[in-house]
Regions:
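Short, Lys/Arg-rich flexible segments
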Residues: 1-164
């Protein structure tokens, strides 16, 4: 059996060019650079923990994106981006869908109550020893036990950036 493929050489060249452009495009999911230094610092402390501040490590980005349902959703959008580029369409909407799926996956992971739970002092407030000031200080509790969520600033800041 013999197979012959006939295609427009210019169309094939254009498809290859579109796929190469897509290959050099990055969809970065997490805290965008516009989130500001304070939120990046808070996320770093939460991800890695802080023995001095008695904050346990609560990794969020990598575990959230590694969950099968999140990975599958992002992969589905990326496959659609490749198909769009191959058809000569702009894959931007599919790349945005991939980024949004990743950001939504991070928020869903936070909503699933990342262990360990908040300490009683974090939830209810109370007196704690401030090592830096070398004195006891009163900390107002946040009133609920949802790790990685207090004001909603960090939670709502998760997003994506597309770098071409």
């Amino acid at each position: 059996m013999k197979l012959t493929i006939r295609d427009d050489p210019d169309l094939l060249t254009e498809r290859i060019r579109a796929l190469k452009k897509l290959k050099s495009t990055e969809v970065k999911v997490g805290l965008p650079s516009s989130a500001g230094g304070r939120l990046h610092f808070i996320l770093a402390v939460q991800e890695h923990g802080s023995p001095i501040m008695h904050i346990p490590s609560r990794p969020v980005i990598h575990p959230a994106l590694a969950k099968n349902e999140n990975r599958d959703e992002v992969a589905k959008a990326m496959k659609a981006a490749i198909a769009s580029a191959w058809k000569g369409k702009n894959p931007r909407a599919d790349l945005e869908a991939a980024g949004q799926a990743g950001a939504d996956g991070i928020r869903a992971y936070i909503d699933s109550h990342i262990p360990p739970p908040n300490s009683p002092a974090t939830v209810n407030g109370g007196w704690i020893w401030n090592r830096a000031a070398k004195k006891a200080v009163y900390v107002k509790g946040k009133g609920f036990n949802k790790p990685l969520f207090d004001t909603g600033n960090l939670y709502n800041a998760f997003g994506y950036e597309i770098k071409e």
